[in-house]
């Protein structure tokens, strides 16, 4: 089973408007509300491609119950309930633009942190891959994801970690490493304190730095240029076909789903990289975030090339 972890989920609310007027009333004809969070996007995609997937994380209040009710029926939900209310994230779509209002989310009490860790540990026996995604809510220490990685490894489980900032820095600085990470160029630049380009030789040097030592898989998205990857000491370049992008939001999460699925099925390097990239591309072709059209999978998969460099 693949277990996804979303520590700071949300109810994603979308308000489409022809014109957004400041300092007055704006009336909305239709509202879209979905269970949101990077980990839940991963969960939905894994369910759509037929993997055995379960979701955990923190939920609370009426929003938490709404989130549970709006998960697909074929997803096992093992969320841990907290006192605070799950946050709202509002997107106002207007004049071809998007204005976002993001709540910070609840502050997690110390006893809730300990309670979740005990709950998380109880799920490890039925799990083979853990996919951890997104930001940490207030109250959780910056090294919290390190604790989750360590517990997973105690049970022999692989971990795909998709986070940024201090949480990622803490994970990279720990002696306990995730199995796979997928930073982009911007995140690499932030980690190293210098500009990192898409030049393959530079990426080879960057991913060979001591900061990344001990991580089995590092997959760097290059957008329309595909991806660059390192598996232990072997480097790969992934080339992808041109596609019509409808909505790129959630493509990184879909890539995480592909990595997690491939690790669970223990496929070879080439198959892992193709699966990760095809799911990211399929998501970008859809209006809905965290959704893929599996009927297009094989055709697109066969157009992706992977070569050792």
UniProtKB/Swiss-Prot annotation:
Coiled coil: none annotated. Disulfide bonds: none annotated. One of its GO terms (molecular function) is ATP binding. The keyword Cytoplasm does not apply. Pathway: Carbohydrate metabolism; D-tagatose 6-phosphate degradation; D-glyceraldehyde 3-phosphate and glycerone phosphate from D-tagatose 6-phosphate: step 1/2. It is an enzyme of class 2 (transferase). Its EC number is 2.7.1.144. GO terms for biological process: D-tagatose 6-phosphate catabolic process; lactose catabolic process via tagatose-6-phosphate. It catalyses: D-tagatofuranose 6-phosphate + ATP = D-tagatofuranose 1,6-bisphosphate + ADP + H(+). InterPro entries: Carboh/pur_kinase_PfkB_CS (IPR002173), LacC (IPR005926), PfkB_dom (IPR011611), Ribokinase-like (IPR029056), Tagatose/fructose_Pkinase (IPR017583). Keywords: ATP-binding, Kinase, Lactose metabolism, Nucleotide-binding, Transferase. GO terms for cellular component: cytosol. The keyword NADP does not apply. Pfam families: PfkB. Belongs to the carbohydrate kinase PfkB family. LacC subfamily. This is Tagatose-6-phosphate kinase 1. It comes from Streptococcus agalactiae serotype III (strain NEM316). The lineage of its organism: Bacteria, Bacillati, Bacillota, Bacilli, Lactobacillales.
